[in-house]
Amino acid sequence: VLEHVGLNPTRTGVLAILRAMGADIAVTNERDVGGEPVGDLRVRAAPLRGIRIPEDQVPLAIDEFPALFVAAACAEGETVLTGAEELRVKESDRIQVMADGLATLGVAAQPTPDGIVIRGGPPGGGRIASHGDHRIAMSFAIAALRAGGPIDIDDCANVDTSFPGFAALAAGSGLDIRVEG
């Protein structure tokens, strides 16, 4: 159970997309804290399937797409994202950087001008360039949970700035993670 998760409706696209992919996610204990909706998430293992992500969900999950790309890599079949050209002008070109990283791990990922096509397959290991993008670094750390080999991620110093304690939380979730340098 993940406790006290923000559930602002302008930010919950990630839940809708994961559920459409087959994820078993239930929201419990919904409440308002400081005027914002929060709740607890119960997540159970479930096979994911590739989908065409509805464009109306893009603005509701724009910052979560690197993690969703990892979910797509672990899904059965093809996931198609369109209408997400904004991802090209974030801290990095998240479409290209994620496509390159997934390819390094042996996952078929074809970038398009406004999105990406990912064919699910088990990720392997490799060295990933995060390009200093905290969301890229954290997403590939998550990928290590399913990878067939170790994943080394370069240029991760800003992760602790945006998500203090990420490495400790990830380790507590079963990830074999080491921060070097």
Segments from the language model and where they lie:
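Short, structured segments at the rim of ligand-binding sites
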Residues: 1-181
